[in-house]
Curated annotation (Swiss-Prot):
The modification Phenylalanine amide is found at residue 9. GO terms for cellular component: extracellular region. The lineage of its organism: Eukaryota, Metazoa, Ecdysozoa, Arthropoda, Hexapoda. It is found in: Secreted. One of its GO terms (biological process) is neuropeptide signaling pathway. Keywords: Amidation, Neuropeptide, Secreted. It comes from Sarcophaga bullata (Grey flesh fly). Belongs to the FARP (FMRFamide related peptide) family. This is FMRFamide-14. Its main location: secreted.
Length: 9
């Protein structure tokens, strides 16, 4: 889900 792209770490 691109909304959570900031969590991709």
């Amino acid at each position: 889900d691109p909304h959570h792209d900031f969590m991709r770490f």
